[in-house]
Amino acid sequence: MTDESELAVQAAIDGEMRLLDPEVRAFSARVLELLDPEFTEIGASGRWWDVESILTVTSGGSVSPESPVKVSEMSGVVVAPGVVHLTYFADNQGRRVWRSSLWRLTETGWRMYFHQGTLAS
């Protein structure tokens, strides 16, 4: 991986970790800084989310400081200029989910464009 690719992947990882931080999730404005205006998600529940609906979840305290999400096996790859694909496992309150995100570089920085969660066996 080139230095430029490594920096892009690290920027996406940093953004992903911020979105999992309960202190970031508590403030819609901070979450919005990290989500692309065209953001969509297919959750582990099978539900489809957009920016507005996901803000309801993040601001509702779905991740508590007492029980933070545990991330493992995080990896990323640049799939096109300005686009990074991340995958990792997230463990939260006894539930293990295989997660996948697409991040794209915008005029305001790296933003999550798409996210999907699949329950892990």
Specify the residue positions occupied by each region the protein language model found.
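A beta-strand edge to alpha-helix "cap/lid" segment located at domain peripheries
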Residues: 2-33, 38-121
